[in-house]
């Protein structure tokens, strides 16, 4: 990926501001919808993935990300699916890291299930990645296999070990699942904090058909927080990493605990994020079906002006917020899966 321009600070005329005055500075990009696990709250076991020919090339993803950086994005997170299963994805990460060197980008990071981390951790650090999120819902090997349908937790643990050895800061993301891992959260938190890792808890979101009712999985984090407050001293902290989590300090462990609550207390009022799928579809809101095709303008011209115009039109339609609903009749609020949208 040579010959691609480097960027400097976005001019005010290019910055993205939505109709509600929110400046867009955070881009999440799904580099693939594929994953080597099948977490039951995320996708069905017999998930049909997109034809590889439908995906943007790595060069196109680089150009698209660079266009958003030119328009004021300061934080870029690569997601999936599982981003590290995309062939040659490290060449994309290394190329995007040039924007860290110019100062146009403050942070380049990714969310991963950890299965490939042992292989890539050192190279990620070498590319300028400083911290990563690892999705891990349990410490129990049998329960991990149940949730992921076939995953080996030892691979994830080896990946976390490799990431910390490489000097990467690791944050653990865990989806709170009713009657499955909710009573394990204290031990998961103490384990994470004991290894100098923050833990962020996430409510189940009604995205995509998974073949079962999410009402059976959904646990309001307000209930879980109240339960934890009976065991630990939780002190609110104003410590945002640019995402939707609200953090507390756990006095007994000294660590941070985050809550992402799209169902019980959405985070729309401060939303600074948009998402791009691996096919070049721009979603300005996680909870709405509305989307804009960026692949067409990307391929229509070697220049970026048409792409900028399409992005600006989409940002101008960004909704004020979403209202997710867990439907007992097993109908998702949003038809697309999180693995396609970019988790």
UniProtKB/Swiss-Prot annotation:
Annotated [4Fe-4S] cluster 1 binding sites: 35, 39, 42
Pfam families xref list: Fer4_12 (PF13353), Mob_synth_C (PF06463), Radical_SAM (PF04055)
Pathway info: Cofactor biosynthesis; molybdopterin biosynthesis
Cited SMART domains: Elp3
InterPro entries: Aldolase_TIM (IPR013785), Elp3/MiaA/NifB-like_rSAM (IPR006638), MoaA (IPR013483), MoaA_NifB_PqqE_Fe-S-bd_CS (IPR000385), MoaA_twitch (IPR010505), MoCo_biosynth_MoaA/MoaC (IPR050105), rSAM (IPR007197)
Cofactor descriptive note: Binds 2 [4Fe-4S] clusters. Binds 1 [4Fe-4S] cluster coordinated with 3 cysteines and an exchangeable S-adenosyl-L-methionine and 1 [4Fe-4S] cluster coordinated with 3 cysteines and the GTP-derived substrate.
Gene Ontology BP annotations: Mo-molybdopterin cofactor biosynthetic process
UniProt cross-references to CDD domains, sorted A to Z: Radical_SAM, Twitch_MoaA
Gene Ontology MF annotations: 4 iron, 4 sulfur cluster binding; cyclic pyranopterin monophosphate synthase activity; GTP 3',8'-cyclase activity; GTP binding; metal ion binding; S-adenosyl-L-methionine binding
Coiled-coil residues: none
Catalytic activity from the UniProt record: GTP + AH2 + S-adenosyl-L-methionine = (8S)-3',8-cyclo-7,8-dihydroguanosine 5'-triphosphate + 5'-deoxyadenosine + L-methionine + A + H(+)
Alphabetic keyword roster: 4Fe-4S, GTP-binding, Iron, Iron-sulfur, Lyase, Metal-binding, Molybdenum cofactor biosynthesis, Nucleotide-binding, S-adenosyl-L-methionine
Keyword Lyase: yes
Residues annotated as binding GTP: 28, 77, 111, 171, 273-275
HAMAP family: MoaA_B (MF_01225_B)
Protein's job: Catalyzes the cyclization of GTP to (8S)-3',8-cyclo-7,8-dihydroguanosine 5'-triphosphate.
Record's protein name: GTP 3',8-cyclase
Organism: Nitrobacter hamburgensis (strain DSM 10229 / NCIMB 13809 / X14)
């Amino acid at each position: 990926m040579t010959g691609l321009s480097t960027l400097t600070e976005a001019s005010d005329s290019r910055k993205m501001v939505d109709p509600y005055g929110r400046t867009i500075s955070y881009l999440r990009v799904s580099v693939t919808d594929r994953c080597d696990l099948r977490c039951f709250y995320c996708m069905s076991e017999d998930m049909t993935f997109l034809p590889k020919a439908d995906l943007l090339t790595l060069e196109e993803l680089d150009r698209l990300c660079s266009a958003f950086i030119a328009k004021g994005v300061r934080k870029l997170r690569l997601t999936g699916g599982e981003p590290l299963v995309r062939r040659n994805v490290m060449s994309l990460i290394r190329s995007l890291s040039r924007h860290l060197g110019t100062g146009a980008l403050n942070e380049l990071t990714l969310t991963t299930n950890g299965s490939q981390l042992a292989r890539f951790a050192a190279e990620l650090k070498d590319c300028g990645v400083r911290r990563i999120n690892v999705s891990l819902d349990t410490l129990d090997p049998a329960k991990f296999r149940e949730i992921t349908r076939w995953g080996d937790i030892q691979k994830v643990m080896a990946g976390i070990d490799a990431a910390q050895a490489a000097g990467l800061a690791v944050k653990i993301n865990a989806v709170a699942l009713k009657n499955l891992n909710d009573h394990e959260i204290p031990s998961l938190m103490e384990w994470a904090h004991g290894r100098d890792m923050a833990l962020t808890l996430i409510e189940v979101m009604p995205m995509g058909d998974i073949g079962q009712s999410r009402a059976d999985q959904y646990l309001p984090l307000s209930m879980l927080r109240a339960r934890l407050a009976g065991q630990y001293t939780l002190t609110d902290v104003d410590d945002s990493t640019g995402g939707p989590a609200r953090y507390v300090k756990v006095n007994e462990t000294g660590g941070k605990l985050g809550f992402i609550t799209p169902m019980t207390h959405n985070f729309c009022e401060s939303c600074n994020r948009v998402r791009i799928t691996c096919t070049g579809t721009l979603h300005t809101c996680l909870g709405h079906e509305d989307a804009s095709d960026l692949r067409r303008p990307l391929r229509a011209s070697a220049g970026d002006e048409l792409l900028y115009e399409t992005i600006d039109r989409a940002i101008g339609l960004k909704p004020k917020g979403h209202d997710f609903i867990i439907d007992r009749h097993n109908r998702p609020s949003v038809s697309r899966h999180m693995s396609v949208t970019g988790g």
